[in-house]
Amino acid sequence: MSQSGSRLFTSESVTEGHPDKICDAISDSILDALLTDDPRARVAVETLVTTGQVHVAGEVTTSAYADIPKIVRDTVLEIGYDSSAKGFDGNSCGVNVAIGAQSPEIAQGVDHSHEVRTGELSDDEIDRQGAGDQGLMFGFATTDTPELMPLPIALAHRLSRRLTEVRKSGVLPYLRPDGKTQVTIEYDGDKAVRLDTVVISTQHAADIDLDNLLTPDLREKVLGSVLAEIDMPELDVSDIRLLVNPTGKFVLGGPMGDAGLTGRKIIVDTYGGMARHGGGAFSGKDPSKVDRSAAYAMRWVAKNAVAAGLADRIEVQVAYAIGKAAPVGLFVETFGTEKTDPARIQQAITETFDLRPGAIIRDLDLLRPIYAQTAAYGHFGRTDIDLPWESIDRAEKLRAAAGL
């Protein structure tokens, strides 16, 4: 149901140099390397980083070969960690690899779905593939922004991307890779009306003046640059509270400051807390894992539903049983913004989208090395890269199915 009255909503993002995001990037870079030579590779790779060390573990079944230590070092160096003075050095860090094969008990349910094994469905390629696990996945879309994402997370990601851009391009050469952003938006009912607070915490070189150098630079080169790019004239940006490194100096960062793990930024990866989350992480998982592929499909469904004018704000949930091809549940929430009966919207979604795992992989062309680019700055609503689940190619068909 839509809400009325003024309220504040906050979302955060992190840069690619955040310890958890280093891990996501390593896991997805390994995945991409394996998918390049073996599109049917089964991959579940987890990474841990800490002071001077990278540990890679998981389960992989593939005919491909990947030089994992080299991928680890190249990824760390590309992010910008090339010196112990920055908290990590991809040239000299220790790399430990512990990879096993996927459980054959899991594989049998993915390779031969419950429906095929019981004779419930025919043995074609789509029917044959069962879900790689049980679970529930959510998708969300809203008219907040042109890319149909919640504004707080959209702005937070843009700020994090810009923070990395000015560091890597040399505009602000004293910045270091680790950083976080946070955006608080005032809503009047369901409409974003004012940018209230921006927090930017960024690692930097020693002896940088916070008040006279860092804060003015970030206000102009990061916040000012991002605000100049967004096309939202109705958003009040006249009185923004900017908080830069509120704890003071931030020299000790990266894995030297905090250990990092794959899959620990799932709210940053999705909708910034404005939508529910099923709990499954994305990075390091091939698309047979519905944690990833079905969450992408649900974003595709939700975005097409809003683009079709079925609702201004929509959240969709799908659920699976391990080894079964067909979803066990579909739920649609329109928050009182629907333009037709929600039951009709749900039926239109069912008619327009095939949510069996094999069909999702086919329709979104997911057996490709496209995942490392998603490891930082969000998996949804990206304006800087082209992702198949951001397409609104089913909007007209969905609108017709809903009778609009």
From Swiss-Prot:
Which residues of this UniProt protein bind Mg(2+)? D20
User: Could you say which enzyme class this protein belongs to?
Assistant: transferase
Predominant place of localization: cytoplasm
Q: Which GO terms describe its molecular function?
A: ATP binding; magnesium ion binding; methionine adenosyltransferase activity
- Residue ranges that the Swiss-Prot or TrEMBL entry lists as coiled coil: none
The cofactor required is: Mg(2+); K(+)
Which InterPro entries does the record match to this protein? ADOMET_SYNTHASE_CS, S-AdoMet_synt_C, S-AdoMet_synt_central, S-AdoMet_synt_N, S-AdoMet_synthetase, S-AdoMet_synthetase_sfam
Annotated region (Flexible loop), positions in chain: 102-112
Q: Which domain of life is it from?
A: Bacteria
Q: What does the protein in this record do?
A: Catalyzes the formation of S-adenosylmethionine (AdoMet) from methionine and ATP. The overall synthetic reaction is composed of two sequential steps, AdoMet formation and the subsequent tripolyphosphate hydrolysis which occurs prior to release of AdoMet from the enzyme.
This one is known as S-adenosylmethionine synthase
Q: Which organism is it from?
A: Rhodococcus jostii (strain RHA1)
The primary gene name is metK
